[in-house]
Amino acid sequence: MFSKETYVGRRAELKKLVKSGIILLFGNNESPANFPANGFYPFRQDSSFLYYFGLQRDGLVGVIDVDNDVETLIGDDIDIDDIVWYGSVDSVKDMAGMCGVANTAPMKQLQAICGNAMKENRKVHFLPPYRHDTMISISDLLGIHPSKQREAASMELINAVVKQRSTKSQLEIDEIERACAIGYKMHTTAMRLTKPGVTEKFVGGQVDGIAQSYGSMVSFPTIFTQHGEIMHGNPSMAVLESGRLALCDCGAETMEHYCSDNTRTFPVNGKFDQRQLEIYSIVEDCHDLALKLSKPGVKYLDVHMGICRLMTDRLKELGLMKGDTEEAVRAGAHAMFLPHGLGHMMGMDVHDMEGLGQIYVGFDEETRPNLEQFGTNCLRMGRRLEEGFVITDEPGIYFIPALIDEWRAKGLHKDFINYEKLETYKDFGGIRIEDDLLITKDGCRFLGKELIPYHPKDVEEYMSKN
């Protein structure tokens, strides 16, 4: 964890932003894989609890009494049975000292703390829960049914957390750079191992092992597939075939729980064919345009629309699209090929803070999502960029047979899409290129000391040498 002063400072700023009431920040509990007495999923602490307290043990709740400036770490010390099986851990009091919290209390006192606050008509702030055990706790403590908890969550607290966590400190940037360094090794390992005859599972398993070997974990389930048209195509036992493209979307999460997230698409046999190169070069140029346009004050929605126009122009040159570019993009015809947004915030969550509500993280009062239009409704980030933001730049082009068939049968966007030509690409798959960007004072830069090869010649050269 960082120094205790880091967490003291973060909580002090949180109190200023929320102004009054009592804040509950729930840590996560262990999650049993089959039954509670034996076998848990790998523990992952709640990111907002980590941000303000830095403690990675299960069964903790942070309570911040804003009005009286009192902070309490709630939790129970483990008993001898736990010590026998899992070893000794720090006491709750010792953990409180690590993050600069003066007071501790056992879990049974949380009910009284919340009950007294409600009797005094004080606001009890909590974030939208995403785990069922947390929902049950909120129901028991505050009497709010789980189905009503998302709408009852504190907007003051949500806005404060988003404001603080959106702008990354140098400590956080350094951690993300560490994650990117591991991510580089993961991706270059995938490039080295990819060849005809090996399975997706083999490559994906080796990639995950790289993260584990650095004391890290994957920042999300690794995507490695020769069906790149499937957005979240997890590795299968399919054998890699010459002439196909392999798409690898993976990242690492450091021991301080900061993430990386990159995507590369490369030829299974190490050499792009002409048709693959034509599509790849469009995605490459869209990726580089986003890099050029992203800077403080620019709306990421405008960057997204800029790459959509470039993509449409280039697909028209290949005969896959037609008509007026502006009209095609306005109508959403480009979403046949790009049914998602350009990128998202990244930090302690790979899709940073989206559990708080995407509309509060990636948008603001000025920029709102278009929830009615296919493709655009998947835009995760549209707000104006600010110095210190960490975002992803991940354009792609996908040829999804089911989507092609559905749109063609309905006659959708027939003035903008050349369905006859498109039919010949049904076996193509998909291409995505993704990098992590830090918004700087006057532009942006790649995160990671070493850039994973993505220009076609660099990809081919790396694969041929390794």
Please place each PLM-identified region on the residue numbering:
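Active-site neighborhoods and metal-handling regions in enzymes and metal-associated proteins
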Residues: 1-466
